[in-house]
Amino acid sequence: MSRIQEAFKGKKAFIPFVTCGDPDLETTKQIVYEMEKAGAALIELGIPFSDPTAEGPVIQGANLRALTGGVTTDKIFDMVKEIRQNTQIPLVFMTYANVVFSYGTERFLEKAKNVGMDGLILPDVPFEEKEEFNIVCKKYGIDLISLIAPTSHDRIRMIAKEASGFVYCVSSLGVTGTRSAITTDIGAMVKLVKEENDIPCAVGFGISTPEQAAKMCQSADGAIVGSAIVKLCEKYGKDCVPYVAEYVKSMVEACK
């Protein structure tokens, strides 16, 4: 059983996201350790990109701050290597096709494997174009995580059939960010996925409160939160670690 599958075993998974290098990589490292202590099941690490099309203003701002601070993909790989000396929590990169391309797809995935990454999410790569990445991901034992949006049933089934690791169910069309209400029928999406593939489904985009997380976890296997955490990093800078830990703890409780 892979580390990702293990993360969903017998429990609902809370999956936090953090932008690497906002405010700096040392703080990101401490955030990862504290998130695990607070009960996170799996952690998404955002590799900053200058044009993050799927992101709302909060995560766009974090990308900009990290890049301005001199964060590079190589420095992030070094950070993950250090993290792996202290924890075996599943780690998944979230970034954009361009970041992987410009590094060299093969080189990127070989390095990801060597430092101990478990998965990769590329929100700007549609299902029809994922194969060139998927072949290399499979070669290195990295799960390429599929995103499923509230679109047609046939499309959801088609994507679910080939999904690996877990399925990222997008709660609403549009960019990431916090929303006051999520109206998508997550239960129906999850049901369609499970009919095709016995794979965990986690819901993201727009979740920020424990109430929302609890509601999502009634029908899904986990909840993913990014913007609400990145807001704390922005607000408190290098002092954000205890605030993030506290927030993650409350969300983990809500997901139970």
Please give the residue ranges for each predicted region.
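Catalytic cores of alpha/beta
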Residues: 25-35, 151-161, 203, 207-223
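N-terminal amphipathic alpha-helix/helix-capping segment at the start of soluble metabolic enzymes
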Residues: 1-18, 79-84
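Active-site beta->alpha loop and helix N-cap motifs at the rims of alpha/beta catalytic domains
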Residues: 47, 60-122, 255
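Hydrophobic faces of well-ordered beta-strands that scaffold small-molecule active sites
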Residues: 14-18, 43-45, 91-95, 120-122, ...
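Glycine/Thr-rich beta-alpha phosphate-binding loop at enzyme active sites
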Residues: 61, 69, 156-192, 232-234
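Catalytic beta/alpha-barrel core
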Residues: 68-71, 116-129, 143-151, 157, ...
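Glycine-rich phosphate-binding active-site loops on the catalytic face of alpha/beta enzymes
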Residues: 40-51, 117-121, 126-129, 171-177, ...
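Alpha/beta catalytic cores of nucleotide-metabolism and tRNA/nucleoside-modifying enzymes
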Residues: 76, 191-199, 208-214, 218-256
